[in-house]
């Protein structure tokens, strides 16, 4: 039996029997792609020498978020002149490291280097995507199963590097490919890398606006699942079997600004999708159940439009509140009405690049300067702790097995009660 046939059988079995992912963090935004973990009892306080179970010296910088399955942690990293895929055990010891691709030129002081997209895993294999366009599948021993060149859909022409993270769903990898040379969404067989379909995605952005740094997600709900893509002035949904467009959110670039690049990804939940834009644009929320056509204030699916938006960090929902994080304030918005609950400055003066994570009614935030904040979820603004790792962090935290993992430019930290 060939490796690809064996992998196809493995993926089919995984799709038939839902994986026990409660203790894992299989993709960039967690088990349900919404930034939530069911873990309880995570420490609110940590530092270089406090509640750090271990720290692992990473080969180099990168903003990819670790994915975790069982005893294995995977992430990509710059490693000299290469992009490497690294596997570290939950004991903090390296299991293996393999070269994925040569590394290209970094953008904006390593904010846009070729180790920006995050990995995905199903517990048997791990998929990594490098900034030169190589998307590859590896087994848990680090052996490459297949590789594909995403630049076959158009030579990359994007200002700050490739950040799109492929989403793994029931044996298929879905990827949005959006820059000045092409606007499309594609579906690849996760077992072989072969294309299932490619759908063109028209947009009307000009100048820099076609450049997109957000990632696609799969929405699950009545009438779904659907692939949700975000970029080039619109957020769209596509049928998983064909890529056909089902709906699109309009009015995200109301002034047709030519520098309206989307970085923050949408929040996708069964009964609410929250769509950020950028800079001084709006945030749009709507009910995706049965949604069709153009989502705008005249469409009954639309619930609210908020006057401002996060520019980089994806929204997160805890209970009946949606949280929007900018470089200074944290804004809480009523999930049903869009009314502002509070808008408060965070105590750490830093830029935020990684996404928020929610666990045990707390929101975990780590900024670019390595200062982590734990905020109590609810209608009252309360910062429970401010924690400084004293190194740059662009990645989002990951939660698995009772541990919080924070990937910095120098170390991967495992945080937990010792």
What are these regions (language model features)?
Residues 8-16:
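Bacterial N-terminal signal peptides
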Residues 1-9:
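Bacterial N-terminal signal peptides that target proteins for export
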Residues 19-418:
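Noncatalytic, solvent-exposed loop/strand surfaces
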């Amino acid at each position: 039996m060939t490796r690809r046939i064996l992998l196809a059988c493995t993926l089919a079995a995984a799709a038939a029997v839902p994986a026990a992912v409660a203790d894992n963090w299989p993709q960039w935004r967690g088990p349900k792609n919404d930034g939530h973990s069911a873990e309880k009892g995570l420490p609110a306080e940590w530092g270089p020498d406090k509640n750090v179970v271990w720290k692992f010296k990473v080969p180099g910088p990168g903003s990819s978020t670790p994915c975790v399955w069982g005893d294995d942690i995977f992430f990509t990293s710059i490693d000299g002149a290469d992009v490497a895929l690294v596997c570290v055990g939950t004991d903090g010891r390296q299991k293996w490291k393999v070269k994925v691709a040569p590394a290209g030129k970094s953008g904006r002081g390593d904010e846009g280097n070729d180790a920006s997209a995050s990995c995905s895993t199903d517990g048997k294999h791990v998929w990594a995507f490098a900034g030169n366009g190589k998307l590859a599948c590896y087994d848990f021993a680090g052996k490459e199963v297949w590789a594909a060149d995403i630049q076959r859909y158009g030579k990359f022409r994007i200002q700050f590097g490739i950040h799109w993270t492929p989403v793994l769903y029931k044996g298929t990898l879905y990827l949005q490919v959006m820059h000045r040379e092409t606007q499309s969404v594609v579906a690849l067989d996760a077992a072989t890398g072969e294309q299932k379909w490619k759908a063109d995605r028209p947009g009307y952005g000009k100048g820099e606006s076609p450049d997109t740094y957000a990632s696609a997600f799969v929405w699950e709900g009545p009438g779904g699942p659907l692939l949700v893509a975000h970029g080039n002035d619109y957020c769209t949904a596509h049928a998983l079997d064909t890529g056909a467009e089902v709906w699109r959110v309009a009015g995200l670039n109301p002034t047709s600004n030519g520098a309206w690049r989307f970085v923050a990804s949408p929040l996708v939940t069964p009964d609410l999708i929250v769509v950020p834009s950028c800079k001084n644009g709006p945030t749009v929320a709507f009910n995706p159940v049965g949604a069709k056509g153009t989502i705008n204030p005249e469409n009954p699916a639309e619930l609210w439009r908020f006057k401002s938006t996060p520019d980089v960090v994806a929204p997160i929902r805890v209970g009946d509140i949606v949280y929007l994080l900018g470089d200074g304030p944290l804004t809480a918005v009523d999930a049903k009405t869009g009314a502002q609950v509070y808008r408060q400055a965070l105590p750490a003066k830093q830029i935020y690049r990684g996404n928020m994570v929610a666990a045990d009614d707390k929101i975990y935030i780590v900024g670019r300067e390595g200062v982590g904040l734990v905020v109590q979820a609810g209608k009252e603004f309360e910062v429970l702790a401010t924690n400084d790792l004293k190194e740059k962090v662009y990645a989002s935290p990951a939660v698995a097995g009772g541990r919080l993992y924070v990937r910095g430019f120098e170390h991967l930290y495992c945080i937990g009660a010792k």
